[in-house]
Design a protein with these regions (language model features):
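Ligand/cofactor-recognition surfaces for anionic moieties
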Residues: 1-880
Length: 880
């Protein structure tokens, strides 16, 4: 027992990830105080420490006075590292320390009576290990572990000595996982009665844990709130579609569910039938198998996760292959919405960046690896400040700080989900699709271009495939006819760079633009001067049946287009806002297809991640499903499209590579260098030749480089691989291109050549676009350069950046070390200092190669936690 002056108090301190158990703890404390006078129960959430240093200080102070400590769900290094010394100190003086469902080093702090998990395994622990059995990857493994958790206390009950404290540990876990008010109360009664010392309280017995379904259904309209029978759920008489909703069992049992209730109500208001399901063990697959998947296919039209975690693994890890297998079998759109745990709603609303690094990793990046799309904030906790995210100005701080819904964001989420779900149910011939082309740089004759892609050839093949699929579209006969219809048509009549599909009058713009004041502050009165005749705005493009091929308007700053994209306080032009509103409301698009890399929508002003109602990408696209054709080698910018414009990306192959060769000027320089290399060092003409080389080098911007280094540089330039031509969707690589790909990817390895040849020949890109337009699941794939990351094959998948807990990879570390050594060898003496610019895109494409180079130069190596996740770096001892 602790030794301090507060002898009348007895303090139970719970340190965990979030505050979902704060409500039960607050509600049961008065009942506990009737039997245990002076007892207090305090919960501290590690998620609050990053943005609220005072919260960490309060936790630290509480641990100094703790009599019983319960620590769980602490897995992140930024949570474990700072609190670990205080947990260690508390362990030495408290009556009991219970570490469960948490990082291994915290579990080993467990001290309950004779049970000390910091010591070598005892006979009881060996028995436990044998009873646990093997750990399998299937969804059933979690169910088996929960059954074992219930069985073990019954078995251990008959073993003497230390086994009884081991039984107490398992019972504590069982109470916690069934975290209702009753179970939290009985857990605390059990621990205090068994382990409190120096007290004269009467011994009380705790009731056994109440068992709740590990896999079940929740709905606020149910009498008991939870059930295991689908037939018990309320269902609209004529539902537009059915949506499967994944919720956290712990929040449902803790009665912290106002945010779930608000989502269910908003979805049902959209005419959707909602199936809110939960599963224990932070593995959503059992819920999918039980309630979303039938014997003949999916029983839902879309699936939405409200957990804020990856589908399989939660905050500790993510088993993305298992998640992808389950989601591919379900084959419906998978949307990941997230509650804010690491900041309040007011902090998020006021933030220019939106989500912080840890939130972005846990709430967005890890679900993306599973194949999740449309990341949307839907809830959070209120602090003392009013949320300024929208006109509602929500507030509502309480002592327990329960989860609060964000009504505006939930409305946006409901719109997105309803559109995706009904898209899947719609008849192909009824679907209206808007395909968006770009022109960048503006005013440079680049309308209808995209990086690495032959746009009009690819678009023509796509339209032909859509017609064959049953879409109401009549493609022009040839590629040139398509190009002429879009870029010429009536363009000359209106003095525009492309065909005019519609004219939107200034009065219409004024009446129907919700953010008119912001646009006019930047661009003057409507209709502005961009793509305008002074009376209104032109919408450029051409319509082919129910498919509209539109051209995204220019940014507005022709001389400096990046100004609009990267400076805060700006707004898109009248033409830009009108274009997307016209596609949504006047053309009536059911889905958008942004065709190639890349447009400007995702770069418009707003938060970096965790979009709010004031963010322009969110305003412009609204709830429209957004399919985005993207080059497979650019995951960094594709990630922006996914996180800022709700894009479901579909990768396409980059063009075949060829040796760059040398052009005029460089060829002449090479000839001179050849002569220099063949000239005797003592020859009289050597000095004259070196002067000529210096002149030729300066003419091609290589001045100041010694001839020997110039020779190496020219050879590297000549042999460099560059894209050869443009990629065409629906066209398999010809023999020469195929040979070029295979030589680079596989060399002389016959088995690899056959494997890559099959993947390269697969016609997967247009079929993937059609699947996305039909509301099907698009499997994820890490993006990257084809040479370094051949796993991008086959294309036609949903690109993501990287697992932030797995970068740099082992290969990247070795390659980075080689690059660091080459850098040092390029200098005659060891440099005193080196500056590196670490570009996100370069690291993403190389799995962290530049980071590996930086670590090698520093003399450090990455540090990984007990789950194999990158958690920091350590200096390498000089002895090594």
């Amino acid at each position: 027992m602790r030794d301090d002056r507060h002898m009348n108090a007895y303090r139970v301190v719970i340190v965990t990830l979030d505050r979902h158990a704060a409500g039960p703890a607050a509600r049961v404390t008065p009942r506990l105080q009737a039997d245990f006078p002076g007892i207090t129960v305090d919960i501290f959430a590690a998620a609050e420490w990053g943005n609220n240093p005072a919260a960490f200080a309060e936790c630290e102070a509480a641990l100094r006075e703790a009599d019983i400590v319960i620590a769980n769900l602490l897995f992140l290094e930024e949570h474990v590292a700072p609190i670990m010394p205080h947990l260690l100190a508390a362990r030495e003086r408290c009556d009991a320390f219970v570490g469960m469902i948490t990082d291994g080093q915290i579990v080993r702090l467990t001290k309950m009576g004779d049970l000390d998990m910091s010591k070598p395994a005892s006979a009881a622990m060996q028995l436990l290990k044998s009873l646990r059995g093997s750990k399998g990857p299937s969804a059933a493994s979690g169910e088996k572990q929960m059954k074992m958790l219930r069985r073990l206390p019954k078995i251990l009950r008959f073993l003497p000595g230390k086994a009884q404290d081991l039984r107490a540990w398992f019972l504590s876990m069982q109470y916690w996982l069934g975290g209702s008010d009753d179970n939290i109360e009985q857990m605390l009664r059990f621990l205090v009665s068994r382990y409190a010392t120096g007290r004269t309280w009467a011994k009380t017995s705790a009731k056994a844990p109440i068992d709740y379904p590990d896999v079940g259904l929740y709905h606020p309209a149910l009498r008991d709130r939870i059930t295991t029978r689908l037939a018990d759920l309320p269902r609209p008489a004529e539902a537009r579609a059915t949506v499967g909703l994944l919720v956290l069992r712990s929040y449902v049992l803790a009665d912290d569910r106002a945010h779930y209730d608000a989502v269910i109500a908003a979805f049902e208001a959209q005419g959707l039938a909602v199936v809110p399901a939960f599963a224990g063990g932070l593995d959503g697959r059992p819920a999918i198998e039980a309630y979303f998947q039938g014997p003949h296919g999916p029983t839902v039209d879309a699936m939405v996760s409200l957990t804020g975690f990856s589908l399989v693994g939660g905050p500790a890890y993510n088993d993305s292959p298992a998640a992808v297998a389950a989601l591919s079998a379900l084959d419906v759109p998978y949307i990941a919405a997230h509650p804010l745990e690491f900041q309040t709603l007011a902090q998020w609303a006021a933030s220019g960046g939106g989500l912080g690094p840890v939130e972005t990793t846990m709430l967005i990046a890890l679900p993306e690896i599973d194949g999740a799309t449309n990341p949307t904030v839907f809830a959070g906790r209120h602090g003392t400040e009013t949320c300024t995210g929208c006109a509602r100005r929500c507030a509502g701080a309480s002592d327990v700080r329960a989860m609060a819904p964000c009504p505006e964001r939930i409305g946006a989420l409901a719109d997105k989900v309803a559109r995706l779900a009904t898209l899947r149910r719609s008849r192909v011939a009824d679907r209206r699709v808007a395909i968006v082309l770009y022109g960048f740089p503006p005013n440079a004759g680049a309308v209808g271009t995209a990086a690495y892609l032959s746009v009009f050839e690819s678009l023509h093949n796509t339209l032909l495939a859509m017609a064959a699929e049953g879409y109401d579209v009549t493609p022009p006969a040839t590629v040139e006819d398509l190009r002429a219809a879009v870029l010429q048509g009536n363009a000359a009549q209106f003095g525009q760079p492309a065909n005019v599909a519609a004219h939107v009058g200034a009065d219409d713009i004024v009446a129907r633009t919700p953010w008119l004041a912001e646009v006019e502050a930047a661009w003057g009165p409507a209709p502005g001067r961009i793509q305008s005749d002074g009376r209104g705005v032109f919408v450029l493009g051409a319509q082919f049946g129910k498919v509209m091929v539109g051209i995204q308007p220019v940014f507005g700053y022709e001389g400096d287009p990046m100004r609009l994209l990267f400076e805060k306080g700006f707004a898109p032009t009248h033409a830009f806002t009108t274009f997307y509103r016209w596609l949504r409301e006047d053309f009536g698009a059911d889905a958008l297809l942004h065709f190639g890399m890349h447009g400007a929508l995702e770069f418009m002003p707003g938060k970096q991640a965790g979009m709010g109602p004031g963010c322009w990408p969110d305003r412009l696209i609204g709830g429209l499903p957004n399919i985005y054709l993207y080059a497979a080698n650019n995951p960094s910018e594709a990630t922006l499209a996914k996180r800022r414009s709700n894009a479901i990306t579909v990768t396409h192959l980059t063009p075949p590579l060829a040796q760059a060769g040398l052009y005029k000027g460089l060829l002449e320089l090479k000839d001179s260098l050849k002569r220099w290399r063949a000239t005797d060092p003592d020859a009289e003409e050597l000095s004259e030749l070196e002067g000529l080389i210096a002149e030729q080098a300066a003419a091609v911007d290589l001045g100041g480089v010694a001839p020997a280094a110039l020779w190496i540089k020219l050879l590297e330039t000549e042999d460099a691989l560059i894209p050869d031509g443009l990629h065409v969707l629906g066209r398999r690589p010809d023999a020469a291109a195929m040979a070029g790909y295979l030589d680079i990817l596989a060399g002389d390895d016959a088995e690899k050549r056959a494997d890559y040849a099959a993947k390269l020949a697969l016609d997967s890109e247009i079929p993937a676009l059609l699947r996305a337009l039909a509301g099907r699941f698009i499997a994820p794939v890490p993006g990257g350069d084809l040479i370094r990351s051949p796993d991008i094959l086959p294309t036609g998948r949903n690109i993501h950046a990287f697992d932030p807990f797995r970068m740099p990879t082992e290969f990247a570390l070795r390659d980075g070390a080689k690059q660091a050594q080459r850098l040092l060898e390029a200098h005659p003496t060891l440099p005193r200092s080196i500056a590196l610019v670490l570009w996100g895109s370069d690291n993403i494409k190389s799995d962290g190669g530049p980071i590996g180079q930086a670590l090698a130069l520093i003399g450090a190596r990455p540090r990984f936690d007990s789950y194999g996740r990158l958690s920091g770096a350590d200096l390498i001892p000089l002895a090594e």
